[in-house]
Amino acid sequence: MAKHFITGVAGFVGSNLARTLLENGEEVVGIDNFSCGFHKNIEDILEDPSFTFYEKDIRDIEWDSGYGDFDAVWHLAARGELYYCRDHIDEAIDVNVKGSLNMLKFAACADAHHFYFSDTSAEYDNIIGEENYPTAETDAPNVNTPLGYYAITKMAASQFIRSYGIANGIGTTLFRYTNIYGPSMNLKRDIPPVVGSFTNKLFDGETPIIFGSGRKRRDFLHIDDLNSFHYAAFKNRQDKTDSQTYNAGCGENYEILEIRRLVYNACMKIDAGVSGGVIYKPDQPNEAEITQADISKAKSDWGWAPKLSIEEGIDRTVQNLWQLRGESNDS
């Protein structure tokens, strides 16, 4: 049994990671300040004797705070909303960069063997031209085209993590997530994840909103496949001083209009009583036209590959969200 420390454990990805580790016999300590996470995401594991939770902010964690030693630190906490970071740049830097530095120091004091970091595929957002996709981990951002503030904070944190890990003998693995979706994703954001946004609008008898033409293409990965990705990363961790980056995606991409069609079809399959139609609004600034991850490195190094097709993943997500809505109405 290994001992893990997870930041952002009450978030969408963090709570799923905690559950995956616990199901595989691991011990987990998690923190969250509930700025983006929700208590309901961890209610089912709070009584697990192998799980301990503290309501804490990553910026307030003391390096030698008495939590004990850990085999792995998973740093997932961040201000992740692109437009929130644009409008609150000081806070984005404070949390995403300075907070990450604080957790690195914590990992060193906790004698952690490995530090895992939730990086972002938004670092590829300014790579122009369909011929340059899918993007590999070695592809560099276009220095002549500006990136969004969220991507910049993640890039800065990534550089510190690699350098700090090498200097202090901590192995580091960085995950560049694409669009992660599934049950318990955060639907309270100003602009929620597209699969959840479409689903909620249809459930509520409203018309889904698409920004721009709907022709932008995105790489989507279901949370169940991300769970197996994370555990493969842990089981295949390298020497203590090693530093690696891996793309976390499905390796394909889909037009937003196609996602809307698949969500609509999934709603029809469960007789959710939805109606068609789309509301088009002006395009959001500084958004990539294409995202598509080259996932051959994870396949080669870990033998990992996503199992769910986009249709299967959306069907499963819509069914689960419909079930959760029914349970909420019954309570």
Regions flagged by a language model, labelled:
Residues 129-141, 187, 240, 269-274:
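Short helix-coil transition/hinge motifs at the ends and kinks of transmembrane helices
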Residues 37, 87, 95-98, 148, ...:
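Residue-level signal for the nucleotide or nucleotide-sugar donor/cofactor binding architecture
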Residues 3-4, 57, 102, 203-331:
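C-terminal substrate-binding subdomain of Rossmann-fold SDR/epimerase-dehydratase oxidoreductases
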Residues 35, 78, 188, 238-241, ...:
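Flexible interhelical turns and helix-capping residues at alpha-helix boundaries
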Residues 1-180, 304, 316, 320, ...:
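N-terminal Rossmann-like NAD(P)+-binding domain of SDR-like oxidoreductases, especially those catalyzing
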Residues 28, 35-36, 60, 90, ...:
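Alpha-helix N-cap/helix-start and coil->helix boundary motif
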Residues 127-134, 159-218, 223-235, 251-253, ...:
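NAD(P)-dependent short-chain dehydrogenase/reductase
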